[in-house]
Curated annotation (Swiss-Prot):
Cystine residue pairs: none
Protein name: Lipid A acyltransferase PagP
Gene name, Swiss-Prot/TrEMBL: pagP
Site residues (Role in lipopolysaccharide recognition), renumbered to this chain: 73
Annotated localization: Cell outer membrane
Function description: Transfers a fatty acid residue from the sn-1 position of a phospholipid to the N-linked hydroxyfatty acid chain on the proximal unit of lipid A or its precursors.
UniProt-recorded Gene Ontology molecular function terms: acyltransferase activity
Protein origin, superkingdom: Bacteria
Subunit text: Homodimer.
InterPro entries: LipidA_acyl_PagP, OMP/PagP_b-brl
HAMAP family found in the cross-reference section: PagP_transferase (MF_00837)
Length: 192
């Protein structure tokens, strides 16, 4: 057996042990996933049925990471995502934000792109003024694009925000490969 084959075999055995552990925690995983899905479903239902706010979404900027694109492409792309959206949101007993939203905006090709989903952010109020807040979380949703024939595409993306009172600047990053994805997208969210 060559050194490369031995190294590969060692890696394969190690990887399989990580991927397929044979212990009690592996048997608990389905229950953990079920519990997480149950909490997610409850949070979505509570946000839909008992919202504290109606939100207005105003897309502000898209930025294609210059290190991940050919200049010819970024020169042609739209980075002004005109559009609007509406949503429902609430703050839970821990002070974290939950929101349901639907938004439409002009994508990189200046075509309309709808998106709808649920967002959650752990929220901190680091200053003595409780009106100032920052958040980190995620969004689960569905979008559709003109260049993909408006086929619904599920998504899971990170969220981050900074806000004061009812105004929040919220953002995400769409990961990708060279000349695809790697887009920063941000919007203003106003709570009423």
């Amino acid at each position: 057996m060559t050194v490369v084959n031995k190294s590969f075999l060692t890696f394969l055995v190690f990887f399989c042990q990580i991927l397929f552990p044979l212990n009690a925690s592996a048997l608990e995983a389905p229950r953990t996933v079920k519990a997480w899905a149950s909490v997610l479903g409850d949070n979505i239902a509570e946000t839909w049925n008992e919202p504290q706010h109606v939100d207005l979404y105003v897309p502000a900027i898209t930025w294609h990471a210059r290190f991940a694109y050919d200049k010819e492409k970024t020169d042609r792309y739209n980075e002004r995502p005109w559009g609007a959206g509406i949503g429902k949101s609430r703050w839970d007993e821990k002070g974290n934000w939950h929101g349901l939203y639907v938004m439409a905006f002009k994508d990189s090709y200046n075509k309309w792109e709808p998106i709808a989903g649920y967002g959650w952010e752990a929220t901190w109020r680091p200053l003595p003024d409780d009106a100032f807040h920052v958040g980190l979380g995620y969004t689960l949703g569905v979008t559709a694009r003109d260049n993909w024939d408006y086929i619904p595409i599920p998504l899971v993306l990170p969220l981050a925000s900074v806000g004061y009172g009812p105004a929040t600047f919220q953002m995400t990053y769409i990961p990708g490969t060279y000349n695809n994805g790697n887009v920063y997208f941000a919007w203003l969210r106003l709570q009423f």
